[in-house]
Amino acid sequence: MHLSDITHPNQLRNLNLSQLRSLARQIRDKHLQTAANSPVGCHLGPGLGVVELTLALYKTLDLDRDKVIWDVGHQAYAHKMLTGRYHNFHTLRQKGGISGYLKRSESRFDHFGAGHASTSISAALGMAIARDRRGDNFKVVAIIGDGALTGGMAYEAINHAGHLPKTNLMVVLNDNGMSISPNVGAIPRYLNRLRLSPPVQFLADSLEEQLKNLPLLGSSLSPEIDRLKETVKLVTAVQNNKAGIIFEELGFTYVGPVDGHNLAELLDAFELAHGISGPVLVHVATVKGKGYPPAEAEQVGYHAQSRFDLATGKPYPPTKPKPPSYSKVFGHALCKLAERDPRIIGITAAMDTGTGLDKLKEKLPDQFVDVGIAEQHAVTLAAGMACEGMRPVVAIYSTFLQRAYDQIIHDVCIQKLPVFFCLDRAGVVGADGPTHQGMYDIAYLRCIPEMVLMAPKDEAELQRMVVTGIQYTQGPIAMRYPRGSGVGVPLAEEGWEPLPIGKAEVLRSGGEVLILAYGSMVHPSLQAAEILKEHGISATVVNARFAKPLDTELILPLAEQSRLVVTVEEGCLMGGFGSAVAEALLDADLAVPLLRLGVPDVWVEHATPEESLAELGLNSAGIAERIRAKFQARVLKGSPAELPTVNS
């Protein structure tokens, strides 16, 4: 059977091992071809590692009834191909195409949406409890990676499920020893030992089956068989120090470890697990990047890939050289400062490469901490370090810091501890879509008393803000910066001067319009001012630098002299930078027209950052056009002949 003929996953139920193996090869080929030619890039290693797992599990289920909950979603590319999306798979992560993650609105087989890790067991348990309350009878399976198992939420769910012995729930642990980077901590170390141990549950259940088949005696031996099974598991555990006793103690029946690339073993394991009452965990050992040697050899680099040569595995060089990314500039600056100050500690939540802290990890490993996928712990860990005079720097994507909101307020801000939050991927993130957009940090941090918020206009100013954040000791301070390359300004190797807290700068003086731009929107606003000049509108452009405290000493006099005030931010309008300016104008009783440009009350779907910004009207042409329209309607009271439409 050809993969393109699969329109429903239940078609797998009638296939033999040979046909399943053929499908596995086709799935990997399709995944690799899509990744190698994708204009936006896609995740690679995780999906290649779960092909056999997906095929075997789906063969044992009735997916018209049963529900599979995938953790995160970039494991689920085989799932997408098997659930009616094969012919659209080439559009993966592109504007108008299929999502790179699970999405309930995209397919009836995507039972729970996810982009952040460690949520699957909680969601699956909720569905299982609802099923039992209604008296339904379908299977619920959560598939979680060992990286996601470093997140505390997974253990909260396991703890709950383990106390519900009559609730049938299967958890499949996809254990490849990695999240994006190699996993850290005691739990991954324990799982690594388990990967090498014999299949304990198979041994115990095989013994049970043989004893029960003894003539005359078998049916009367049930209590003794149970005790013998436990003895077998315990003896195996003692001999190998690797059996899944921790999961058994938490109330789960443990099955495994199973070879995640052996379809026959997987089918046996899943059939066995389906017959076990109560919570059961099937431990499947997989190889990230399986079937593509470059991805198996370099598992961190091939977690996700932009376009590459399939024959060699090497990425295609960019058409023209790009400036260094904000993440790299940040990592370099922090490393330079840490070399001179041993109090500086860089903290990440399983994202050392993505945040630029890999440089610190390499050069100064004693000043680097990776806590795993545990953002809550990362923030309170930093709070504890700050109590003891260290200078903790928490580098986390904007979207992931949301997971530690209580810790930010309760453990850091109330105690006025000098923790420096560095929010990477702030603003639109592109192909990852709504689960990863960094739209909300300005709003959710600005409302916290005494929190300082800053954003650089370019990579050179970012260097100065790193120094500013390190030297600020009066309490918490946060810096946000976008995904991708800087604007290409010259960079000094060191000697960066700190910025005065709460002070903005005027970059361009005009007269009629005052544009207050924050962070990544400064350069598009400068370009918009040039466009407006061509159409007879003069504009002052201010680099706000700080959303809190706002530089009212600079802003209010300029606003009073202007006919229109405009705020521009790459974040949500509700509660954001524009709201801060609106509050300041109201408090000062300044009745000047105000236009706030930013992200409205919508979910921003996956697309390239450029496509998203254009759609939101946050590129230079869009900013200029919206200012022109507002100026014409509210200030000039309508005179279209004077102001031609700006071409976007």
From Swiss-Prot:
Function: Catalyzes the acyloin condensation reaction between C atoms 2 and 3 of pyruvate and glyceraldehyde 3-phosphate to yield 1-deoxy-D-xylulose-5-phosphate (DXP).
Cofactors named for this entry: Mg(2+); thiamine diphosphate
Assembly behavior: Homodimer.
Binding positions (thiamine diphosphate): H74, G115, H116, A117, G147, A148, N176, Y292, E375
Name under which the protein is recorded: 1-deoxy-D-xylulose-5-phosphate synthase
Keyword Transferase: yes
UniProt entry keywords in alphabetical sequence: Isoprene biosynthesis, Magnesium, Metal-binding, Thiamine biosynthesis, Thiamine pyrophosphate, Transferase
Entry EC number(s): 2.2.1.7
Binding-site residues, Mg(2+): D146, N176
The keyword Oxidoreductase belongs to this UniProt entry's keyword annotation: no
Record-linked PANTHER family: 1-D-DEOXYXYLULOSE 5-PHOSPHATE SYNTHASE-RELATED (PTHR43322), 1-DEOXY-D-XYLULOSE-5-PHOSPHATE SYNTHASE, CHLOROPLASTIC (PTHR43322:SF5)
Gene: dxs
One GO BP: thiamine biosynthetic process
Record pathway: Metabolic intermediate biosynthesis; 1-deoxy-D-xylulose 5-phosphate biosynthesis; 1-deoxy-D-xylulose 5-phosphate from D-glyceraldehyde 3-phosphate and pyruvate: step 1/1
